[in-house]
């Protein structure tokens, strides 16, 4: 297994798919990285030379991934909560942030439904 940005990527998959195991790298970014490094998307990770692995590492190091990206996202959410914006208030209350209705659904954000005593008749 090759190690890129602190993540073990699978050996038996194509490089373009294996790179998506790194947080912050999707399929589009993976393709851009390989194009910049001059590596074919069809190559398997186990077939990469050490020079090719180093080229991929250099390209990935130029992008904000893994811990740095997670930290930035968390700081952005914290900043929204501190300034008291609508989105920050929704984050603080654990409700959907992007305008979804909450009358019936939104169970993922709100948690398990709590039964109200005396409601059933």
From Swiss-Prot:
User: Where does the record place a coiled coil?
Assistant: none
Listed transmembrane segments: none
Classification via SUPFAM superfamilies: S13-like H2TH domain (SSF46946)
Single Gene Ontology MF annotation: tRNA binding
Q: Where is this region: Disordered?
A: 96-121
Protein family: Belongs to the universal ribosomal protein uS13 family.
Name this protein carries in UniProt: Small ribosomal subunit protein uS13
Q: What is the originating organism of this protein?
A: Streptococcus pneumoniae serotype 4 (strain ATCC BAA-334 / TIGR4)
UniProt gene name: rpsM
């Amino acid at each position: 297994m090759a190690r890129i940005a602190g993540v073990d990527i699978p050996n038996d998959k194509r490089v373009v798919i294996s790179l998506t195991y790194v947080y912050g790298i999707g399929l589009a970014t993976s393709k851009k990285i390989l194009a910049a490094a001059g590596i074919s998307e069809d190559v398997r990770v186990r077939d990469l030379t050490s020079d090719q692995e180093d080229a991929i590492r250099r390209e990935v190091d130029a992008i904000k991934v893994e811990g740095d990206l997670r930290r930035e996202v968390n700081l952005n959410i914290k900043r929204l909560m501190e300034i008291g914006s609508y989105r920050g208030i929704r984050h603080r209350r654990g409700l959907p942030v992007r305008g979804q209705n909450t009358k019936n659904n939104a169970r993922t954000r709100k948690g398990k439904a709590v039964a109200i005593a005396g409601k059933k008749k």
